[in-house]
Design a protein with these regions (language model features):
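Short small-residue beta-strand/loop micro-motif enriched in glycine and branched aliphatics
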Residues: 8, 130-134, 188-191, 215-216
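Basic, flexible linker segments flanking DNA-binding modules
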Residues: 4-99, 195, 251-257
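C-terminal domain-tail junction helix/linker
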Residues: 182-186, 208-260
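Active-site beta-loop-alpha junctions of metal-dependent nucleic acid enzymes
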Residues: 116, 135-157
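RNase H-like two-metal-ion nuclease catalytic core shared by retroviral integrases
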Residues: 80-82, 166-168, 174-175, 190-210, ...
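Mobile genetic element proteins and their domesticated derivatives, centered on retroelements
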Residues: 6, 26, 42, 58, ...
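Generic alpha-helical secondary structure signal
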Residues: 1-5, 21, 144, 148, ...
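An active-site-proximal beta-strand-loop segment
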Residues: 97-132, 138-140
């Protein structure tokens, strides 16, 4: 090898990678979020950290490091039970809210861990997608719905005029459920029969959770999944950023809205 060629390659090896800091932070973000972030969310988090960088550069750097999100959205089957209608579809697919606690959504989804069936029932705020409260049970019963409501009411005691939207599941038709929300001056709204898009906020969360947690990891027991779910919901509320929330997590977005 000619001496000039040798020194040329040696100089290139010694040259500082101008994207070294960016690469370190990209790897840090990717692993912190357990590989759940693609290049767009990584870009938003990089900007939160003070980097001035566009998504194409982040995508190129991730490709050069062979980093790629393995998460893919999947369809899920929610638990419906018997259906009926006792409330109008007030929301009517208008999932926008200008402030917290104007519109909430709830639903129940079935989760299979081995031979055990679990049922997750959360309440989401349509303003920022935050999980207000939730209950996970081995049976889709009224007690889990009441517990979910009680936890939400412990967090917020003034909910006059709030709209709580659900599908036409039997739980939401029950007198006990209706009485509890009426006592807090909450307005009940129900999807049309068999129309999943009418409750897209809740269905979207279930799809994300199942993609990023249930199908991304292995659980040897229902208890292991429940523990992981508790950690995931805390992560989802406090750390997982969304493009529609201007690169903020649900809690960050709510906090900033209240400051402003």
């Amino acid at each position: 090898m000619a001496r000039s060629v040798f020194y040329y390659h040696l100089k290139r090896l010694k040259a500082k990678d101008k994207y070294a800091d960016e690469k370190d932070n990209i790897k840090s973000i990717f692993h912190e979020h357990k590989g759940r972030y693609g290049y767009r969310r990584v870009t938003a988090e990089m900007r939160n950290r003070g980097f001035i960088i566009n998504h194409k550069t982040v995508q190129r750097l991730m490709q050069s490091m062979n980093i790629k999100s393995q998460i893919r959205k999947v369809r899920y089957r929610s638990y419906k039970g018997e259906v009926g209608r006792i409330a109008p579809n007030i929301i009517n697919r208008d999932f926008e809210a200008s402030a917290p606690n104007q519109k909430w959504a709830t639903d129940v989804t079935q989760i299979n861990i081995g031979s055990t069936k679990l049922y997750l029932s959360p309440i989401l705020d349509m303003f920022n997608g935050e999980i207000i409260s939730y209950n996970i049970s081995k049976s889709p019963n009224l007690e889990q719905i009441y517990d979910m409501l009680d936890k939400a009411f412990e967090k917020y005691d003034k909910l006059d005029g709030l709209i709580l939207h659900s599908d036409q599941g039997w739980q939401y038709q029950h007198f006990g459920y209706r009485q509890r929300i009426e006592e807090h001056h909450i307005i009940q709204s129900m999807s049309r029969k068999g129309n999943c898009l009418d409750n897209a906020m809740a269905e979207n969360f279930f799809g994300i959770m199942k993609s990023e947690l249930l199908y991304a990891e292995e659980f040897d027991s229902p208890e292991a999944f429940i523990k992981a779910l508790d950690e995931y919901i805390d992560y989802y509320n406090n750390k997982r950023i969304k493009s529609r929330l201007k690169g903020k997590s649900p809690v960050q977005y709510r906090t900033l809205s209240q400051i402003g």
